[in-house]
A protein has these predicted regions:
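Metallo-beta-lactamase
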Residues: 1-19, 35-46, 107-141
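Intrinsic-disorder/low-complexity coil detector
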Residues: 7-8, 19, 61, 100, ...
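Catalytic core of the metallo-beta-lactamase
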Residues: 14-22, 27-36, 133-141
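Short beta-alpha junctions and helix-cap segments that line functional grooves
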Residues: 20, 29-31, 89-90, 112-113, ...
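Pre-active-site segment of Zn-dependent metallo-hydrolases
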Residues: 24-29, 36-79, 91-100, 104-108, ...
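N-terminal Rossmann-fold NAD(P) dinucleotide-binding loop
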Residues: 86
Length: 141
């Protein structure tokens, strides 16, 4: 039995777990983790912009804590499009583990690479076209 709220029970082989880390009930911080056969695939990694009642706050990041000790299990980060609420937190995630492959369209990856350049981070990227299928770890994209 799990005693830590961030330590969910073990999955049976072949079972998919979906872990939303942001973006639910808010416009921003979009980040969802899919777990399958011990591997993690992240979809989006965005920021939330603060509201007027949050002076001094520049950006609000997704909560990386549930996956912080599992970053070696991450097989990729799929970026659906280039809006800040989907890509804005990528540099902060890559500061924790820089070799996570980024997967997205040519335009989306160009926007992310410009952002990463500001942070002096060089990422491994995989450009995909519409309709293209890829195998990333145990995940079929």
């Amino acid at each position: 039995m799990s005693t830590n709220v961030f330590d969910p029970p073990a999955l049976e082989k072949g079972t998919l777990r979906v872990i939303p880390l942001g973006g639910l009930g808010e416009i921003g911080r979009n980040m969802t983790v899919f777990e399958f056969d011990g591997k993690l695939l992240i979809v989006d990694c965005g920021v939330l912009f603060p509201e007027e009642h949050q002076p001094g706050v520049d950006l609000i990041l997704p909560d990386f804590e549930p996956i912080r000790d599992r970053l070696d299990d991450v097989v990729g980060l799929v970026l659906t499009h280039g809006h800040e609420d989907h890509i804005g937190a990528v540099p902060y995630l890559l500061r924790l583990k820089q070799d996570i492959p980024l997967i997205g369209s040519q335009l989306t990856l160009a926007l992310v690479e410009a952002k990463l350049k500001e942070h002096r981070i060089k990422a491994y990227t995989l450009t995909v076209e519409e309709g293209q299928e890829e195998q990333v770890g145990p995940f079929d994209l």
